[in-house]
Amino acid sequence: MLVRTITFIALAFASFSPVSAAAVAVDRAHVEAHENFLAGDALKGRGSATNDEAIAAAYVASQFQSFGLRPPPGWTSFLQTAPVPVTDRTRKLGLPKNARTTNAVGFLPGTDPAAGILLISAHLDHLGDVRGEVFHGANDNASGTTAVLELARVLAASGSHKRSIMFACYGAEELGLIGSSYFGSHAPVPLRDIVANIEFEMVGAPDPQFASGSLMMTGFDRSTLGPTLRARGALIMPDPYPEEKFFERSDNYSLALEGVVAHTISGWATIPTLHTTADTVANIDFAFMTRAIQSLVEPVTWLADGDFRPQGTGEGAPSKVKP
């Protein structure tokens, strides 16, 4: 199985040329290559806590290393594994009692340790192979994982930043935010040092009701982060689906429960292909996805290089009792 993993990663690397400090724009070729690997047939949908999920995490870790990122402080590896609680759902999925999920975490040191840390994240798992049907999860959430990878590449290539930036891709989100919850309680840095967490979820297609190129941010009114990033040029707007409770349904919530200012950015969150076998690379809008990721580069760079610390507004502050 290790040979299989290394072969997959080596094939994926073949699509890339060396990164120079001048190459700091989001690259559609990189976006497509990441998507094609993560949501390709070989990984069978990256089912939560499966070997395919572990291969996806190893791929992300290898990319982090190639960008010049380091393992997080105190870690000797880019990978973190977490136990998966036994539930009726894990039994139905046939997961073993000792199943574990895998997070991939990379760290870009800043020049001012006192300035805090910016956390950029996504979940890398999906539904996987369900009774012989493969749910590839190209939009949910190979697209968010790809966004993290491209931002990591661009931000690392553009030189040093004042703040350290941590990039995390979590496992087992589909089983109930398991990877991110474990990360939140076993973080490599004090959570009080995390200035903000921006999570990416389903950025592979535009919502037809938004202005061209716009994205939504969950919990927009819960902190000053969204309005400030929008003022800096981020094409984000408030979540138009409050009844769906998207703020509580993605990995940002695990960090928000720990007191971190944390939000998720999405494209078409109610897309009809969600959790269907039609969520494939063929249905990804690569032009939109590339523009969407690029639209966050300048605002995130500003956040990484400045002194602004977003504050919670007290609007719907989460409690430790999960929905």
Regions found by a protein language model. Give the residues of each.
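Alpha-helical metal-binding/catalytic segments enriched in His/Glu/Asp
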Residues: A104-G106, I120-G176, L296
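Bacterial N-terminal signal peptides
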Residues: I6-P18
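Extracytoplasmic/secreted proteins, especially bacterial periplasmic and envelope-associated proteins
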Residues: V26, H30-A33, F37, N51-S66, ...
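A non-catalytic alpha/beta surface segment that caps or lines the substrate-entry region
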Residues: R46-F107
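N-terminal capping segment at the start of a domain
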Residues: A25-I55, F67-P73, L79, D125-H126, ...
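Second-shell loop/turn segments in exported
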Residues: A22-V24, D41-N51, R91-L95, G132-N141, ...
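Metal-dependent peptidase/peptidase-like ectodomains
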Residues: P113, S160, Y170-T264, W268-T270
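His/Asp/Glu-rich mid-to-C-terminal helical/loop segments that flank catalytic regions of hydrolases
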Residues: P272-P323
